[in-house]
Swiss-Prot record:
Subcellular location(s) per record: Membrane
Organism: Mus musculus (Mouse)
Keywords, comma-separated and alphabetical: Coiled coil, Membrane, Phosphoprotein, Transmembrane, Transmembrane helix
Claim: Coiled coil is one of the keywords in the record: yes
Name of this protein: Single-pass membrane and coiled-coil domain-containing protein 2
Keyword Membrane appears in the UniProt entry: yes
Length: 347
């Protein structure tokens, strides 16, 4: 199990290093692409168009291959190794000492379910984020290619218009008829209108700003992913250190148990810890009951003597026994209550 944890930790560290390298490469490539876009927008000739398209295609292929490789590595890291042969090989490579302590460590330090759930959650989250980053990166490259195509189209239209203007100027030098002059003026006005439309389109579509915004978003997502990977690595290192400490403590406990001498059977009866005194507990409970009983009786007697003498017979007993039973008791006690003092005296 320790070898599995070490393998997963090593894979996660390799993935974090690759994500860092990819971040640096993507930032440098993005800056180069933006500089190339600016350089392309300033060029007047059409000679370098195939080379630019080839550069963008090659960059796109390289980035997609890198993202696909990282996604495959993340998917492989999600699936733990299930082959028993590989586990046996790793256990044999650890040495004879580890093989001797392996049953005690496996029995004493099982992997908690919370750790496996957290690892599965982080692996799934990393895979989703890698897919999202790959999709965003591909979308960003497609948009940049579209922007470059729009710039090339505008350059071609402007160049064609310039050639038409030059041809019209050459024709205007050799003019003889007024009809040809009117046609040339109409063509010039149409060319001006087309140039105005091209300028409006260029002002509406700000290619450089859009590319920068997309690149900033991609960089932010990569940075957040890098932070989460650092957090995951720190958690994995913490769990690994806790597992190693637990293994060391368990091994020390086993050694101490083996070194302790055997105690004879008569010793537990002699050295048994004294049981808690139950008689003392019952005595305390009895004392509390007696105190409460005495306090209640004295309180009732004081209330009856000094406050209300009929409290017991007119309030407590009727509420407890009922009015019907009270009337029956009064009828039974009536002859004794109506006795006079002379009847009680001896004759």
């Amino acid at each position: 199990m320790m070898s599995l944890q070490l393998g997963t930790a090593g894979k996660e560290r390799q993935l974090a290093e690759k994500s860092r390298d990819l971040q640096n490469v993507s930032m440098t490539e993005g800056s180069e692409e933006v500089s190339e876009m600016d350089h392309i927008s300033d060029r007047p000739d059409e000679k370098d168009k195939p080379s630019e398209n080839l550069q963008t295609d090659s960059l796109y292929k390289m980035d997609t291959e890198k993202w696909d490789g990282l996604e495959q590595e993340s998917e492989h890291s999600q699936d733990p190794p299930s082959k028993p042969d590989e586990q046996e090989v790793t256990l044999v490579c650890e040495g004879p000492q580890v093989s001797q302590l392996s049953p005690s460590t496996d029995e004493s330090t099982p992997i908690p379910e919370s750790l496996t759930h957290k690892l599965n959650y982080w692996h799934a989250k990393m895979g989703l984020q890698m897919k999202e980053l790959g999709a965003d990166h591909g979308d960003w490259l497609e948009r940049i290619n579209n922007i470059i195509q729009n710039i090339n189209n505008t350059e071609s239209t402007v160049k064609s218009l310039l050639t038409e203007v030059i041809s019209l100027e050459n024709q205007s030098k050799n003019l003889e008829d007024s009809d040809q002059e009117a046609d040339i003026e109409e063509k010039i006005t149409e060319i001006r209108r087309q140039l105005k439309e091209v300028n409006i389109k260029l002002t509406q579509v700000d290619a450089c700003e859009e590319a920068r915004e997309l690149k900033e978003k991609l960089v932010e997502q990569i940075e957040s992913f890098h932070k989460e990977m650092n957090v995951l690595n720190s958690k994995l290192e913490m769990y690994y250190t806790q597992g190693s400490d637990a293994d060391s403590h368990n091994s020390e406990d086993v050694d101490t148990e083996q070194e302790e001498p055997l105690v004879p059977e008569a010793s537990p009866s002699l050295s048994a810890s004294p049981t808690p005194p139950c008689s003392a507990v019952w005595k305390n409970a009895l004392k509390l009951f007696v105190i409460v009983y005495v306090v209640t009786i004295t309180g009732l007697s004081c209330y009856i003597l000094f406050v209300d003498a009929t409290f017991l017979f007119e309030r407590v007993l009727p509420s407890v026994l009922g009015h019907r039973t009270m009337w029956d008791l009064r009828e039974m006690m009536a002859p004794f209550l109506n006795l006079e003092a002379e009847d009680l005296l001896p004759s």
